[in-house]
A protein has these predicted regions:
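Domain-scale recognition of functional cores that engage charged ligands
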Residues: 55-57, 68-328
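Conserved metal-phosphate-binding beta-hairpin within the catalytic cores
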Residues: 39-70
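Low-complexity, highly charged intrinsically disordered N-terminal segments
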Residues: 1-36, 61-62
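Amphipathic alpha-helical regulatory segments at dimerization interfaces
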Residues: 7-8, 40, 255
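Structured beta-strand/loop patches that form or line metal/cofactor-binding pockets in enzymes
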Residues: 23, 28, 37-48, 316-326
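Amphipathic, alpha-helical segments enriched in basic
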Residues: 29-31, 38, 47, 168-171, ...
């Protein structure tokens, strides 16, 4: 999916494809970020760690978004080990996450895990991860570190919207562009946009996605990725409506009943409000006035911080076993 999205963005930016996909994905970003993600030095680079946010619903799993700068690698590794030691059959075994994470850096002699102040709550997890894999090879550094050596591999644990506050960002990306070091995730803000799901569901791009993904995988993603729309305030022709919604103007979202508001508004990306549970509004859980205010923010914020609208699939309840330490 990321390979296909990378191709669509590149073709659009280079004029080999309609301009609107890259225009959407570049919306609200400074020219420095746009230049960086279009740089030929990072042309084919993709994130090497991807965490899908998966909801288990009555109709099967749904992937609500993808995170290419995720926390939780160390936590998942610890859980894998704990459950394996307790006798559970864990996908990947006790060391699957550790082995997988170590494997993305190839044979680099030094692996630098660079954590920004904004992401500092995850630093203990990164330090644990480095210590479990190889403390002589893996090291954790703050946002001021810039002593990169030729051949180093870097895991970027800071957000692109925060670059102005990360002194190491400029020398890091310059060294990566010169091929003196490698870095993941690459500085491609468009791959961190939730609106990629809206591009996937856009009928104008269906054939392009099919060519890039193949019929089978396209059908798989159609079942997994919830229907998504970009809140673009550009007016529609009088006879047109947003597919799957029957609305002709985003203002009409305000008049939907609470049942009809089984929809989520989210900030698409490139914002300090675009991660965690921030920047998310579930229409069916909000009173009409709060939902209307969120709709207004989405419409008015398109140029600076685009929002997406996504069909909400309610998670299902499942039975789970647990261990009672008092009863044994």
């Amino acid at each position: 999916f990321y390979q296909a999205a990378n191709t669509i963005y590149r073709w659009s930016a280079e004029g080999r494809f309609p301009a609107w996909p890259s225009a959407w994905l570049d919306r609200g970003k400074p020219q420095s970020i746009i230049d960086l993600q279009r740089s030929k030095e990072f042309r084919a680079e993709l994130p090497r760690v991807i965490r899908p946010d998966i909801l288990l619903t009555a109709d099967g799993p749904r992937i609500t978004e993808l995170d290419s700068v995720p926390g939780g690698i160390g936590l998942t590794a610890w859980l894998n080990r704990a459950y394996t030691e307790a006798g559970a059959e864990v996908l990947g075994g006790a060391t699957g996450m550790l082995d997988g994470f170590a494997g993305i850096f190839g044979d680099a002699a030094n692996v630098r895990l660079v954590v920004s102040d904004e992401s500092a709550t995850y630093r203990p997890e990164m330090e644990w991860l480095a210590g479990q894999i190889d403390p002589g090879r893996f090291s954790v550094h703050g946002q001021d570190f810039a002593d990169f050596g030729d051949g180093d591999a870097v895991y970027r644990f800071f957000e692109l919207f925060d670059l102005a506050n990360v002194p190491t960002a400029e020398p890091l990306f310059a060294a990566a562009a010169d091929k003196r070091i490698s870095v993941t995730a690459p500085p491609k803000a468009f791959l961190e946009e939730k609106m990629l799901f809206a591009l996937f569901h856009n009928r104008n791009l269906t054939e392009t996605w099919r060519q890039q993904l193949g019929d089978s995988f396209q059908r798989t993603l159609e079942a997994l990725l919830p229907q998504t729309w970009v809140i673009d305030p550009a007016p529609l022709p009088p006879h047109a409506a947003f597919p799957g919604l029957g609305l002709t103007d985003w203002q009409q979202l305000k008049s939907l009943s609470q049942k009809e508001r089984n929809l989520i508004l989210k900030i698409s990306g490139y914002s300090e409000q675009a991660w965690g549970a921030r920047g998310v509004w579930l229409g069916s859980d909000l009173p009409r006035d709060e939902w209307s205010a969120a709709v207004d923010q989405a419409i008015e914020g398109f140029d600076e911080s685009p929002r997406i609208l996504q069909r909400y699939h309610r998670p299902t309840r499942v039975d789970a076993e647990w261990f009672d330490f008092e009863l044994g």
